């Protein structure tokens, strides 16, 4: 990251986040890159997403073949169930795809839900970290940014919460990511689907 935002362009003094409605001028190369990213989430993830690994710290995201297939599946299907072992990188690729989704679609709502609120917030935190390390010219300006939610200037929002029947009551969501759903007790899972299914 070589770009620097001046203090007036920063969201609440964070030098890694662009404030909403900050004017931007794009080079021809940047316009080409944006077009490629809009068309292909795998291109975006490979070229503009950084993740934290235990061994190497912050590094560019190098997808495995199964993660590329997951992205294709998400992008081409309304409903997807993934059954994968722990520590396989499933949550990381889903978070990367959700970042692409909110960045390049206007006025969409996304919920990240997990068996515990702390898990959901950790997932959102990983998405936020990836966002902060994107080039500023690619970022949407930030309207709201905290441990439980974010809102971008394009009107797209993400919320993180524990899975329960009341977790996202009253909202309509374009995408709901349910992590660790196997650990949700059956009675809560049933109530959750009864209240949430009509919203998607």
Language-model region placement:
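Phosphate/NTP-binding elements of NTP-utilizing enzymes
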Residues: 2-200
């Amino acid at each position: 990251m070589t770009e620097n935002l001046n203090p007036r362009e920063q969201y609440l003094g964070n030098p890694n986040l662009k404030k909403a409605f900050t004017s931007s001028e794009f080079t021809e190369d940047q316009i080409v890159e944006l077009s490629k990213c809009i068309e292909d989430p795998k291109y975006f993830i490979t070229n503009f997403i950084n993740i934290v690994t235990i061994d190497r710290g912050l590094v560019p995201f190098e997808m495995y073949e199964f993660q590329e297939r997951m992205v294709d599946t998400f992008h081409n299907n309304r409903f997807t169930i993934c059954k994968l072992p722990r520590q396989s990188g499933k949550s990381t690729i889903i978070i990367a795809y959700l970042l692409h989704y909110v960045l390049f679609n206007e006025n969409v709502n996304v919920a990240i839900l997990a068996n515990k609120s702390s898990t959901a917030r950790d997932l959102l935190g990983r998405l936020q970290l990836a966002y902060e390390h994107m080039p500023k010219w690619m970022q949407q300006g930030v309207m709201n940014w905290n441990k439980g939610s974010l809102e971008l200037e394009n009107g797209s929002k993400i919320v993180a919460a524990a899975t329960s029947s009341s977790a996202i009551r009253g909202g309509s969501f374009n995408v709901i990511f349910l992590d660790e759903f196997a650990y949700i007790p059956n009675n809560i899972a049933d109530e959750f689907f009864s209240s949430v299914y009509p919203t998607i």
